Amino acid sequence: MSQQASVGRGLPPDVLAEQVELWWSQQPRRSLLCFSVAVILVAGCGAGGVALLSSTSSRSGEWRLAVGTVLCLLALLVLVKQLMSSAVQDMNCIRQAQHVALLRSGGGADAVVVLLSGFVLLVTGLTLAGLAAAPAPARPLAAMLSVGITLASLGSVLLLGLLLYQVGVSGHCPPICTEAFSAQNGHGDNSSIFSISGQLSSGQRHETTSSIASLI
C-alpha cells in the first residue's frame, strides 16, 4: 500500500485523478490502526457475546441473553462494514473521492461504527451496573456488576480513543483527494480558457470579414 501511495504522489494530478484504486491505499498507518480496532471489536464482542449466551442459566438467563445478543449484533455490524468496504473496493464501483474517503479503512464510516460501538457498550454497562443494585441473589448480582463495569470501561475507552483520533487527524487533508480536486479545477480552468480563446477567434473572424467587405 505504501508503495502505491508513493507512486501515486509522483504522478501528475490529471493522471492521479483517474487512478481510483490509489485513493483506497493512501495513509496506510491510519488504515492499519482502524482495521486493527475493527478486528479487536469483532473478536472481543463476538467472544463475549458467545460466552454470555453459552453461560445462560435459569437464575441469570434474562440479562445474559440480552447482553450476549447485543454484543453479537455489534460484532456483526463491525464485520459487515469491513466486508462492505472490501467488496466496494474490489468491484471499483465508486468513482468519487468523497465516497472513497468515507468507506475506506480509516474513513468516516469507521468513525461512525466506533462511535456507535462505544455508545452501545457504555449504555449497556451502565444499565447492568444500575440493575445490579436491585435486590437479587448474590451470585447473579456480582456477575452482573462485573460485566457491567467491564462493558462501561470498554465503551469509555472507545469513545475517548475516538475523540483523540479525531483531534489528531483533524486539519489533515488527504493528498490524493487534494490532487484530484486540483486536477478537476485545472480541467475547469482549461475549458474556460478554451472558451475565451474561441470567443476571441470568432471576434477576429468577424473583424476580418467586415474589413474585406469594406475593401470591396
Curated annotation (Swiss-Prot):
- Would the keyword Membrane be found if you checked this record's keyword annotation? yes
Listed InterPro entries: TMEM125
> Superkingdom of the source?
Eukaryota
Record's protein name: Transmembrane protein 125
How does the entry describe its membrane topology? Answer: Multi-pass membrane protein
Record-level GO cellular component terms = membrane
As for subcellular location, the record says: Membrane
Which PANTHER family does the entry mention? TRANSMEMBRANE PROTEIN 125
Ranges that cross the membrane: 32-52, 65-85, 111-131, 144-164
Sorted keywords for this record are: Membrane, Transmembrane, Transmembrane helix
